[in-house]
């Protein structure tokens, strides 16, 4: 009974141990991984809003400002700018925060005032991997999207203009995208290239016609690619406000990643009240988000240079000019300022940028569609990127003009050299968001292969299937149960083995001897007397001389020899 209880105790102990290990594995598997936090600031957010971003080792914070304008009065479009916090002496930091700020201006009325470029979205990505050597700065990407301006340039060109000459109609996007040499513009280039651009861009409509107009701002992360069609409206450009005393100050939204884990979004003057629009749509928290702004004509404003931090440069702006609203054709420009640690030339494509953000593989592809009218040929801007204290070679590349469409897709907007630069910006393998050489100019820009490495690598996660868990349980339970059985058998054998006297040889000898004498008891004979001598012996008894018993009638009996009796020397009698 005791032995069976011991075996049961051993099996119960092994079962409890297996159960504890299984629960530990299940807890390790089901522990939720940190997700990217997403803060959405609606248009009604008061000035000075503090957005707190958790400062983990790899955390991406997306701040999106939607600024819809009511009917009638023009208002300033937001010019968000995300500026990195530079590190002194080029030491490799240990944390990475990527803040992407984007502003969408929702168009409304048909008679709104179009004076300059509408939102100028500047996304400065602070990429700080640990494997970066000293003296090498993180790449800085600035994206500016001016959707509307007046058509005729002024005589005084803007400061430090770097603009590529217009692309001929027969040229391909690869050639236009790969050339990165900035060409100074010609002052009289407006009248020279007006007709060529009008022929290349047939979608420009005269004043007063109805056409679909709006801005679709999409942040692609993973496989979430959804959008909402904008509402059609008309664009009525008027006399610009640039250079007058009544020119309003730009509304600047700054999202600055600082070590204090907060992002400050200050706002300045705004001419018109803002209200929330149903166009802001937020997708699933875990996978990604899609933001769509619906509305009518954008109330375009001028975003001038207004620094928001000591390290931040002014927001890039484009000066609108006087002229006929129907002279210039419609096109949209993208400005991409990249400040990498090496002086490698790179090309850009309008409406698409990919941010390399630290050791977590994450790709943010922004597709912006902003059809507009009347951007002059000679007008250009110079976006200034916030530079780091370390040695940085700044290269300003202007984007190529492209045709105005209702919705700008990413099928033919992905450049090949940009993906190469992004993938080789940092030497760490985990920082490579886009594999080099996978995207080609002629192929469709499918982002499904980028989303495969989209999961955060915060820790070594263990993913086990049901069969794996079953094998683990068997591998743990079988040795424990076998050991318990062996211990039980050994204990039983030890208790059976006791001190047995039968193993001694002398015991058997004594037993055999005693048993023999007990069974074969020999009764010694008494005196045998004959009738003749009985009287004589009674009369005179005498003893045999010198032990001679031959004549006395005595019988010597050998107990070990039971066949014969010796009576004297010559008399043998059988018993």
Curated annotation (Swiss-Prot):
GO terms for biological process: cellular response to brain-derived neurotrophic factor stimulus; dendrite extension; dentate gyrus development; modulation of excitatory postsynaptic potential; neuron projection development; positive regulation of neurotrophin TRK receptor signaling pathway; postsynaptic density organization; receptor-mediated endocytosis. Residues 31-169 are annotated as: Interaction with SH3GL2. It is found in: Membrane; Postsynaptic density; Endosome membrane; Cell projection, Axon. GO terms for cellular component: axon; axon cytoplasm; dendrite; early endosome; endosome membrane; glutamatergic synapse; postsynaptic density; postsynaptic density membrane. Keywords: Cell projection, Endosome, Glycoprotein, Membrane, Synapse, Transmembrane, Transmembrane helix. Residues 173-407 are annotated as: Interaction with DST (isoform 1). Glycosylated. Residues 74-87, 146-160, 290-318, 353-366 have a biased composition (Low complexity). Its main location: membrane. Residues 65-398 are annotated as: Disordered. The chain crosses the membrane at residues 9-29, 469-489. Residues 95-115, 244-271, 329-352, 367-398 have a biased composition (Polar residues). Signal peptide: none annotated. Residues 490-575 are annotated as: Interaction with CYFIP2. Interacts with DST (isoform 1). Interacts with SH3GL2. Interacts (via N-terminus) with CYFIP1 and CYFIP2; the interactions associate TMEM108 with the WAVE1 complex. Transmembrane protein required for proper cognitive functions. Involved in the development of dentate gyrus (DG) neuron circuitry, is necessary for AMPA receptors surface expression and proper excitatory postsynaptic currents of DG granule neurons. Regulates the organization and stability of the microtubule network of sensory neurons to allow axonal transport. Through the interaction with DST, mediates the docking of the dynein/dynactin motor complex to vesicle cargos for retrograde axonal transport. In hippocampal neurons, required for BDNF-dependent dendrite outgrowth. This is Transmembrane protein 108. It comes from Homo sapiens. The gene is TMEM108.
